[in-house]
Amino acid sequence: MTNILELLKSEKVEWKKLGEVCEFNRGKTITKKNAIEGDIPVIGGGQKPAYYHNESNREGITITVAGSGAYAGFVSYWEQPIFLSDAFSIEPNQKLNKRYLFHWLLQNQSRIYELKQGSGVPHVYGSDLAKFEIPIPSLETQEKIVEILDKFTNYVTELQSELQSRTKQYTHYRDKLLSEEYLTKVTKEMEEDRRLNIVTLGEIGEFTRGNGLQKKDFLDEGNPVIHYGQIYTKYGFVAEEVLSYVSDEIFSKLRKAQKNDILIATTSENVEDVGKSVVWVGEDEIGFSGDMYSYRTKQNSKYIAYYFQTNAFQKQKERKATGTKMIRIHGDDMEKFEIPLPPLSLQNKIVKVLDKFQILLSDTKGLLPEEIEQRQKQYEYYREKLLTFDVECSRTNVHNI
């Protein structure tokens, strides 16, 4: 690491606009209805494939940028054939190492997100990104930088793979604990005079549709609110504090959620994510946006929210989700979704077990999530130093590189 930083001090660097050294190409429109089942990922406006097709329109290594939606501007790197849809690809010329370009784009991911335009469905355009200037050292130096940064990302990938394995174990036991078969058995053992009820969400709670909140309304302080997009990117399973605030005037017009309400995002790029929820456990009443619902029940909210994560619930979502580019699910459909409902005492016990699983999952194998975060921060730190050509960069805290 010291050698490469010394090299960068005297490196001759040329700055060029991306449009001068890269070719930007839009994808081809396709809908899930028109796709033919296959194993080629269709890359659109999300962070992962929208669905799969039987043919590709990009071969080899491809850098893509999501063109529209909540994740417009998201940068991806593909080493397999893909079908590029609602996104654009970036192909560098011979002056640029493709992997170097990818790391540089990641370094500027927040700037790319800031290119979003549109009040409805936001878009990011290649013509705007093409104006960004990129530092171009020699190809030899680019390769050395890539080698260093890839070591960080490979290690993070290994840690994430191990964490994913633990997550699969958790998912298995969660689905088993919340299965109708298991709940029927346990309910019978606990209370001979009670049966497991299969009920609809509408029978045990009430959905309230959100309204009116836009990100442009956000303030640094004021009345607490949650926007549907934040459920995907900012919040976990539960939340007791918000990240955004609005004025008294805006807040007075919003639907409100109370402690133990479940907040459900009902618009997404894909059917897997639509319906993602967060349990509000804060003491304050909060406002919430359109494209989401609150769900209020006298049952254990966390029990119901855990059930929202199961494969059984996912199948119900798939039957009712609508849309192609933007997937939606409606409150009147969710009211009809079925859920196995044991006595409240058993709900509480199951939640207690699953909460412990969650803690173990986040604390497993030498505090994996914390180590992943630490390595990711290391990667971001040295990416900043290596790709902005900061000659004063630190040479400390580099281990096992």
Question: What kind of feature is each model-predicted range?
Answer:
Residues 1-401:
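Charged, alpha-helix-forming regions
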